[in-house]
Amino acid sequence: GYEPSMEITCTDGNLQIRRIHEDGTEEKTVQQVKHPGDAIRQILKEYKSPVLENMPTFTGGLVGYFSYDYIKYSEPKLKLTDETVQDFRDMDLMLFDQVIAFDHYRQKVLLITGVMLEDLEASYQKAEKKLQEMADLIRNGEKEEFPPLELESEIKPQFPKEKYCKMVEKAKHYIHEGDIF
């Protein structure tokens, strides 16, 4: 994806949506939700990508992650403890309607942008302009040098080895019993 048009995050039911408009302005909404999936489904109703032959399977949409803790929205009976809760957002997604895809098999770069159907002619012209800007960036963009990454702190395991091994054995038992998968 290239230049997200929206960022969606949720932690403990606190859903934040940041829309990034073409002119660079931003609109942020925050709301308390019981299940963030409802908001995601509503957003996805506005964005549909056709499946086209000779195109990658991903031509735009949501990219990101759902943490392990996201299960609490679908299975509220599960009581997550401080020991099991990770220090991550429950979900962190970005909406991309511009994609630079590398087809390694055909040795081609594909530039993709979404077109909204409300005002098709104006939307098509905007898409042409975006595609030209993307092509110019690839052809003329400057290579950015980054310094080597350095760890800011020592990597430490979250649990001692013995405790971790016990947790794995317990999980295997639950899998065998059909309680988890």
Q: Whereabouts are the PLM-identified features?
A:
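Short, flexible active-site-proximal loops enriched in glycine and acidic residues
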Residues: 48-56, 139-146
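Short hydrophobic "helix-edge" motifs at membrane interfaces and signal-peptide entry regions
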Residues: 54-57, 167-169
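Short acidic (Asp/Glu) patches
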Residues: 36-53, 76-87
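Extended accessory regions or peripheral subdomains of proteins
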Residues: 1-32, 68, 72-181
